[in-house]
């Protein structure tokens, strides 16, 4: 028959707000559970990526509440920064007006989705009450030498007209607008995240349930390398060039060395060269290239012979010194030793420029003709006293020991991670609370004067320089130290600074005296469950981890990690790319709220595939979830009308067995974030209920009420509106009290969790009966993993009553 979703959903959304659903009392004696979805950029409407995120989060919130937890699940807005400002520019509306209008709209859409949050804790990064404390934390970092201003080659986006952090550049393009990024030398503000390289890497092992791919992405970005550092003297001078290598075992194979065009000795090298014109031209050309262009594997490497020689310290041989733009000044020492026999990039370079190639490692100790670099392990040759040693480890350790003994080198660890560039030449951001005084230099604003307010200006387009530099009343100020005339910093902060600590502010959103209370922070953090997109693995998640460690060392908090458990949802793609406002390919939920209802949309997001997988959006499946809810509506009403009996028959016993199996499987699947299988299990039970109703016209009242209450409670976290309405209409209760418990007498030793793997990795699971066959297990796998092409399966490994693994 169906139901009026518009009327029902509005009714329950109003009820949850009126009854303070989602409001958390931090002082409750219940076990705490901090459940947090990443807060959004309010730069447009909610899209399906948001809907997926907030549906997952709401399922966890409602489930944990019914399991007796004191759940904190707040919501706020990442409302400063490029996304909001660019959207405002496109619409011709001032960023503040645009942002606050979008916040109002997006909040309404979240409520229409049926998600419950503690709106009493709502925060917005652009609010003075919030960015006052962002500025205070910046000053704390500055006073503890964790924030500094310095010259550096930086990534510049001509379209966004601002500097970008390395993490915001994807394959040489701006992550926001896809414009080519080029290099500029500018004086910018940085956070010393590199100081925490070791700890950020080592403490990945202390995290709870984090996806391996996220930890791997952070590990690779931090990029720890172990090796040796030594000096190569420039012949006939007192100058030395330091080089770092991860392959000390190849040091006898050096046939040339390379420095970056920006190397600290580049001027001296040019002066020594007889090839000044070509060198200067090459240096000038390199300055116009982006880092991506310089490192791209697609382009042939270029360089210029300086005509200068350097000495290999291990054997005294002189080799040519080249300049090449594939060497970056801020990686390692800005100089490399080149061993073409055992590095493919060096091999290609040497072949191109006809440089000697000397083999020092061979497969079996015998020399051979090399048509490409030999990079495998082997035996050292042409290496004097080290001949015969095994590469890499044995020979490297011996050569490092010799370098140290001779006083010409040392073992060293280096990291790819560089300091976090936070300066932005944009208007819509948190002002950096620093002042430059002619006498005192850089001076932080006094805490009592915070916030340094972002002025209301109409001309916020930055045609040249920072927009705030044009505002005299903002720029001109007094030095806090000496009182003389001074000027304010006119860059604003990267919006990722705002989001690096927002999860702390939720605990004290209205405090004017402090950003957070350390006692409460230590009680409630780290966040028990964090939910958001995998695309934030390097940016937001790494920055937040740094922030917590820095604030700990300053003495403001005691914790060392912000998020104990992380669920990284897959992206919603549309038209082949991630659905996002910046790409203009969003699909708004409002039409579906109107046509099918929020519950149908929620269920479809949960049913479309494993939530960790990225999926291509199409709306065909939402018809199916709406039909399912219509059947639930009809079945529950029919069941409530079945006349009562004094005892249960075999059909009722079987229905109760099916119900308890479903309780067990749904509970297990929620705990394991396997939401797509929950929907399958609920659909299966609803079909069993339909069959039961066709065959039976009476049922014991206790059993009837148990089936209605427990079935609806299982559905409630996923589709809360219709579940609440059916509970109210049929059992006279407006709220679910507790999560259903399995009655073991119905399922004792009858079921187990079938693990479904693809290439040895768990992709799904299902509660099934003992003795389930391989054929049935395969059928379940096809049902739960529709995105897998089972025609590609090469081998099936089936272990009775345990797992099935498909090798593709």
Residue ranges and their predicted role:
Residues 194, 199-224, 260-304, 450-478, ...:
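Amphipathic alpha-helical
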Residues 2, 11, 15-19, 90-248, ...:
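Residue patterns forming the tRNA-binding/recognition surfaces of aminoacyl-tRNA synthetases
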Residues 57, 70, 263-364, 369:
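Catalytic alpha/beta core of large soluble enzyme barrels
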Residues 1-36, 65-74, 98-105, 209, ...:
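Conserved oxyanion/phosphate-binding beta-strand-loop segments in alpha/beta enzyme cores
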Residues 78, 143-155, 159, 250, ...:
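Helix-rich, typically C-terminal accessory recognition domains appended to large enzymatic cores
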Residues 308-314, 318-331, 360, 475-613:
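Alpha-helical recognition segments enriched in aromatics with Gly/Pro capping
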Residues 25-95, 122-137, 245-246, 313-349, ...:
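N-terminal catalytic cores of NTP/NDP-binding nucleotidyl/phosphoryl-transfer enzymes
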Residues 1-32, 260, 272-277, 307, ...:
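Basic, alpha-helical terminal appendages of large translation-related enzymes
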């Amino acid at each position: 028959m169906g139901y009026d979703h518009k009327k029902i959903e509005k009714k329950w959304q109003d009820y949850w707000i009126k009854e303070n659903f989602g409001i958390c009392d931090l002082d409750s004696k219940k076990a705490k559970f901090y459940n947090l979805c990443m807060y959004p950029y309010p730069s447009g409407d909610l899209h399906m990526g948001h809907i997926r995120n907030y549906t997952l989060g709401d399922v966890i919130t409602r489930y944990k509440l019914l399991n007796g937890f004191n759940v904190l699940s707040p919501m706020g807005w990442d409302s400063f920064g490029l996304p909001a400002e660019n959207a405002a520019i496109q619409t011709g509306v001032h960023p503040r007006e645009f942002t606050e209008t979008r916040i109002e709209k997006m909040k309404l859409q979240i409520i229409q989705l049926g998600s419950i949050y503690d709106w009493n804790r709502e925060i917005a990064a652009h609010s003075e009450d919030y960015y006052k404390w962002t500025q205070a934390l910046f000053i704390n970092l500055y006073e503890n030498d964790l924030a500094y201003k310095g010259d550096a080659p930086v990534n510049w986006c001509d379209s966004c007209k601002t500097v970008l952090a390395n993490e915001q550049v994807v394959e040489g393009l701006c992550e926001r607008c896809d414009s080519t990024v080029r290099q500029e030398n500018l004086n910018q503000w940085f956070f010393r995240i590199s100081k925490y390289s070791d700890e950020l890497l080592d403490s990945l092992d202390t995290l709870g349930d984090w996806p391996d791919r996220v930890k791997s992405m952070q590990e690779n970005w931090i990029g720890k390398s172990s090796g040796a550092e030594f000096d190569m003297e420039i012949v006939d001078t007192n100058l030395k060039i330091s080089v770092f290598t991860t392959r000390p075992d190849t040091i006898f194979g050096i046939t040339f060395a390379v420095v970056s065009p920006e190397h600290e000795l580049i001027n001296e090298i040019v002066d020594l060269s007889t090839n000044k014109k070509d060198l200067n031209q090459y240096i000038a050309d390199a300055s116009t290239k982006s880092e991506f262009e310089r490192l791209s594997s697609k382009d042939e490497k270029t360089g210029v012979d300086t005509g200068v020689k350097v000495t290999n310290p291990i054997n005294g041989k002189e080799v040519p010194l080249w300049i090449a733009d594939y060497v970056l000044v801020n990686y390692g020492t800005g100089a490399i030793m080149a061993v073409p026999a055992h590095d493919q990039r060096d091999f290609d370079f040497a072949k191109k420029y006809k440089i000697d190639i000397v083999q020092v490692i061979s497969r079996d100790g015998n020399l051979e003709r090399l048509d490409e670099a030999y990079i495998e392990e082997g035996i050292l040759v042409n290496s004097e006293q080290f001949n015969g040693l095994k590469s890499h480890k044995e020979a490297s350790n011996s050569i490092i020991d010799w370098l140290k003994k001779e006083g010409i080198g040392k073992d060293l660890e280096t990291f790819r991670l560089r300091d976090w560039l936070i300066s932005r030449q944009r208007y819509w951001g948190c002002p950096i609370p620093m002042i430059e005084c002619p006498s005192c230099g850089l001076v932080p604003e006094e805490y009592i004067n915070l916030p340094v307010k972002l002025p209301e200006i109409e001309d916020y387009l930055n045609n040249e320089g920072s927009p705030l530099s044009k505002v005299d009343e903002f720029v001109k100020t007094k030095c806090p130290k000496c009182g003389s005339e001074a000027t304010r910093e006119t860059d604003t902060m990267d919006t990722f600074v705002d989001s690096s600590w927002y999860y702390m502010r939720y605990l004290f959103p209205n405090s004017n005296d402090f950003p957070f209370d350390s006692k409460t922070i230590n009680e409630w953090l780290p966040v028990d469950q964090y939910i958001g997109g995998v695309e934030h693995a390097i940016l937001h998640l790494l920055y937040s981890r740094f922030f917590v460690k820095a604030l700990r060392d300053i003495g403001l908090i005691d914790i060392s990690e912000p998020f104990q458990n992380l669920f990284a949802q897959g992206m919603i793609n549309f038209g082949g790319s991630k659905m996002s406002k910046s790409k203009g390919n969003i699909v708004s939920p409002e039409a579906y709220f109107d046509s099918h209802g929020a519950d149908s949309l929620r269920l479809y997001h949960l049913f479309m595939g494993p939530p960790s997988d990225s999926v291509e959006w199409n709306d065909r499946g939402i018809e199916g979830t709406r039909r399912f809810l219509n059947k639930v509506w009809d079945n529950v009403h029919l069941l409530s009308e079945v006349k009562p009996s004094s005892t249960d028959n075999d059909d009722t016993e079987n229905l109760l067995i099916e119900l308890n199996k479903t309780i067990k499987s749904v509970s297990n699947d929620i705990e394991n974030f396997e939401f797509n299988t929950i929907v399958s299990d609920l659909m299966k039970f609803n079909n069993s209920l339909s069959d039961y109703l066709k065959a039976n016209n009476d049922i014991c009242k206790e059993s009837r009420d148990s089936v209605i209450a427990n079935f609806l409670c299982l559905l409630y976290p996923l589709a809360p509106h219709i579940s609440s309405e059916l509970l109210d209409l049929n059992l006279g209760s407006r709220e679910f009290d507790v999560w259903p418990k399995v009655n073991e007498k119905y399922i004792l030793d009858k079921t187990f969790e079938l693990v479904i793997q693809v290439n040895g990795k768990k992709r799904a699971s299902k509660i099934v009966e003992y003795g389930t066959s391989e054929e049935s297990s395969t059928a379940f796998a096809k049902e739960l993993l529709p995105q897998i092409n089972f025609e590609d399966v090469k081998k099936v490994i089936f272990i009775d009553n345990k797992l099935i693994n498909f090798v593709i």
